[in-house]
């Protein structure tokens, strides 16, 4: 992936942030968002980041290799976490928006433009933004944010796997796999499960 999209904007803007989230669909764990700003005129091949892509298309090992490199070469980056109890209270969409806004607010310097993966965004600050469908596969800064969000969340869920070994969080990361649903049926929900996410498989409405 290249920074061609950013290059088209850099003549007039220097601080462009990509943002993306991880963890909207799981039954357990937080939703995580990341924001990344690269230096103006940054070229990925000079940093060994030309293999960057949408995090879902990358192997776990490659994501883990790329994440520290992204942090090293980014001008600014930030990650924000919204826990399951907040998700249950305000719903997953609002929690995702809050995570994205918190990530942007945590950057050491505010961006002049935000590039958002998806088709909806509700900014808290008066910063211009663009929503880009499948942006994590098209825009370098968004792809970088997707990797940081995904690796951060995976680390959280792997730790939960040690705390709650019956559930296998380190394997499915909270997503509704057959083994995860069976574990909920057998052992019930943990404190890190989202109570508002109901399971038709268990007769919940």
Curated annotation (Swiss-Prot):
Protein name: Ribonuclease HII
Listed GO MF terms: manganese ion binding; RNA binding; RNA-DNA hybrid ribonuclease activity
UniProt keyword annotations, A-Z: Cytoplasm, Endonuclease, Hydrolase, Manganese, Metal-binding, Nuclease
Pfam families, sorted: RNase_HII (PF01351)
Annotated cofactor note: Manganese or magnesium. Binds 1 divalent metal ion per monomer in the absence of substrate. May bind a second metal ion after substrate binding.
InterPro entries associated with the record: RNase_HII, RNase_HII/HIII, RNase_HII/HIII_dom, RNaseH-like_sf, RNaseH_sf
GO cellular component terms, semicolon-separated: cytoplasm; ribonuclease H2 complex
Gene: rnhB
Cofactor list: Mn(2+); Mg(2+)
Catalytic reaction(s) noted: Endonucleolytic cleavage to 5'-phosphomonoester
Enzyme Commission code(s) on record: 3.1.26.4
Binding positions for a divalent metal cation per the UniProt entry: 20-21, 117
CDD domains assigned to the protein according to its UniProt record, in alphabetical order: RNase_HII_bacteria_HII_like
PROSITE patterns per UniProt: RNASE_H_2
Chief localization: cytoplasm
UniProt subcellular location: Cytoplasm
Upper classification of the organism: Bacteria, Pseudomonadati, Chlorobiota, Chlorobiia, Chlorobiales
Class of this enzyme: hydrolase
Highest taxon, organism lineage: Bacteria
Family: Belongs to the RNase HII family.
GO biological process: DNA replication, removal of RNA primer; mismatch repair
UniProt cross-references to PANTHER family, sorted A to Z: RIBONUCLEASE H2 SUBUNIT A, RIBONUCLEASE HII
Domain RNase H type-2: 14-205
Function: Endonuclease that specifically degrades the RNA of RNA-DNA hybrids.
């Amino acid at each position: 992936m290249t920074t061609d999209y950013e290059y088209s904007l850099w003549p007039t803007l220097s601080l462009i942030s990509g943002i993306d989230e991880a963890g909207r669909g799981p039954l357990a764990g937080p939703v995580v968002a990341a924001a990344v700003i690269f230096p103006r005129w940054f070229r990925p091949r000079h940093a060994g980041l030309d293999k960057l892509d949408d995090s879902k298309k990358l192997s776990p090992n490659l994501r883990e290799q790329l994440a520290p490199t992204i942090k090293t070469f980014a001008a600014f980056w930030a990650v924000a976490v919204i826990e399951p109890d907040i998700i249950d209270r305000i719903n997953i969409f609002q929690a995702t928006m809050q995570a994205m806004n918190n990530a942007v607010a945590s950057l050491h310097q505010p961006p002049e433009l935000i590039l958002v993966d998806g088709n909806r965004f509700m900014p808290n600050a008066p910063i211009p933004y663009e929503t880009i469908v499948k942006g994590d596969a098209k825009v370098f800064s968004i792809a970088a944010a997707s990797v940081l969000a995904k690796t951060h969340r995976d680390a959280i869920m792997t730790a939960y796997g040690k705390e709650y070994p019956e559930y296998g969080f380190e394997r499915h990361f909270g997503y509704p796999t057959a083994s995860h649903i069976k574990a909920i049926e057998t052992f019930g929900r943990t404190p890190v499960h989202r109570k508002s996410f109901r399971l038709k498989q268990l007769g919940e409405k």
